Amino acid sequence: MNKIPPILEIGGVLISSEILTEFFCCDYEKCKGICCVEGDAGAPVTLEEIADMEEALDTVWSQLSASAQSVIDKQGVAYADKDGEMVTSIVRGKECVFARSLSPSASPRDEGSQDPCWLCMLEKAYREGKTKFCKPISCALYPIREKNFGNGLIGLNYHRWEVCRDAKEKGKALNLPIYKFLKEPLIRRFGKEWYQELCEVAEQLLSEDV
């Protein structure tokens, strides 16, 4: 049995081997989209994504809470966090401005919904064919976190978060490793050829590790 190295290099991208060996599959019925709420800052975004969110704003505006609308009016769809990185704006130090907790009978403009299920209004509009932008790639790639080391060097790590414990259990039950669960966003970020190379390397290493 050959031990899988902790860090792999695929097409100029450094990858934690945990992305190949750990299992994950979002279990929305259990987590209720709480990742859009928990945390001390918004989701990392690029300048291009900020422009995309601003372009989609008119489409989703009526679906946002009054509190979210107020935050956006004051500081926009994004702000610089304590590390100077641009992230999505948040409400009351909690939920993303584009997240809503809705009940089947409540108006999307009503505050105080008791329904614990959180939805991304950007993704909702995208899936309804109303916008071309789905959501920031950092959201789509979770639990993978991307880090830019400079000089074109990028690293991908597995971010462990207690709120995703059900996703770990579901992924294990389905025998679904992180890199397969995140096939679409990984292709969106790095391309089909890069993802194919990742799969080939993963299959070879995992077969040797048996």
Predicted segments with their positions:
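Low-complexity, intrinsically disordered short segments enriched for Gly/Pro and polybasic residues
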Residues: 102-108
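Short loop/turn segments that flank or connect secondary-structure elements
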Residues: 1-102, 115-210
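A cross-taxon signal for low-complexity, glycine/charged-rich
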Residues: 108-114
